[in-house]
């Protein structure tokens, strides 16, 4: 398994708490894949831990462990037992407790990734839980998805439009999706991605480093 090289990390000053990055989006959009790719792309420079949310299982925790995203002890699965939106917004106590437990184990952590359970376009993270929010949608959901709006589309710090390779198969026009995204988000950034091929992952990492004040 891979251990983070904390001695040479480009990291926040330890006077600041670790950066908390929330990853949300509908079921099947690619949240877990994004989290896997971020962990693999950042673990050599930063001390990372990850928390996943599922309603009745710890499936995403299992998938990340099998994929070798991080050592098993650095990934915690949370069973919300109900609406995934509630667990990251209205009553985020179960996730706040998970963050506290992980930081007790790994007090030098630079970044805590928190993946929500699959939810609708209205899902948002509590500011108590997340410093940066990344919302993932996918092209297979239809060209119209950006136009539907909702806080995930319009208010997230970064919007990831995944599975661009499927556009020809589902009749989606990526130029239209990009145009609609700009109309809905204004100056807020977005990234077109094919996460399975690592296309766009570097842009997401650069965003986290810049907005999270991780670069020196």
Curated annotation (Swiss-Prot):
Family in the record: Belongs to the SIMIBI class G3E GTPase family. UreG subfamily.
Annotated function: Facilitates the functional incorporation of the urease nickel metallocenter. This process requires GTP hydrolysis, probably effectuated by UreG.
Sorted UniProt keywords: Chaperone, Cytoplasm, GTP-binding, Nickel insertion, Nucleotide-binding
GO molecular function terms noted in the UniProt entry: GTP binding; GTPase activity; nickel cation binding
GO cellular component: cytoplasm
Major location category of this protein: cytoplasm
CDD domains in the record: UreG
Pfam families xrefs: cobW
Record's keyword annotation contains Cytoplasm: yes
Subunit structure: Homodimer. UreD, UreF and UreG form a complex that acts as a GTP-hydrolysis-dependent molecular chaperone, activating the urease apoprotein by helping to assemble the nickel containing metallocenter of UreC. The UreE protein probably delivers the nickel.
Biological processes annotated in GO: urea catabolic process
Residues reported in the UniProt entry to bind GTP: 25-32
InterPro entries: CobW/HypB/UreG_nucleotide-bd, P-loop_NTPase, UreG
Protein name in the entry: Urease accessory protein UreG
Subcellular location as annotated: Cytoplasm
Gene behind the chain: ureG
Organism this protein belongs to: Burkholderia thailandensis (strain ATCC 700388 / DSM 13276 / CCUG 48851 / CIP 106301 / E264)
Cysteines joined through disulfide linkages: none
């Amino acid at each position: 398994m891979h251990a983070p090289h904390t001695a040479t990390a480009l990291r926040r000053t330890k006077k600041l708490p670790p950066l908390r990055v929330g990853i949300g989006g509908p079921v099947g959009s690619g949240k877990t894949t994004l989290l896997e790719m971020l962990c693999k792309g950042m673990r050599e420079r930063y001390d990372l831990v990850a928390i996943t949310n599922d309603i009745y299982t710890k499936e995403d925790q299992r998938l990340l462990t099998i994929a070798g995203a991080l050592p098993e002890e650095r990934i915690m699965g949370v069973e919300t037992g109900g609406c995934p939106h509630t667990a990251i917004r209205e009553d985020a106590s179960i996730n706040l407790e998970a963050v506290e437990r992980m930081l007790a184990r790994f007090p030098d952590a630079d970044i805590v990734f928190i993946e929500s359970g699959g939810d609708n376009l209205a899902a948002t993270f509590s500011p108590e839980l997340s410093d940066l929010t990344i919302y993932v949608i996918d092209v297979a959901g239809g060209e119209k998805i950006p136009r539907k709006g909702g806080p995930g589309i319009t208010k997230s710090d970064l919007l990831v439009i995944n599975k661009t390779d499927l556009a020809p198969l589902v009749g989606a026009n990526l130029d239209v999706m990009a145009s609609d995204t700009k109309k809905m988000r204004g100056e807020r950034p977005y990234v077109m991605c094919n996460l399975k091929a690592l296309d766009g992952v570097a842009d997401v990492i650069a965003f986290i480093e810049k907005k999270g004040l991780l670069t020196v």
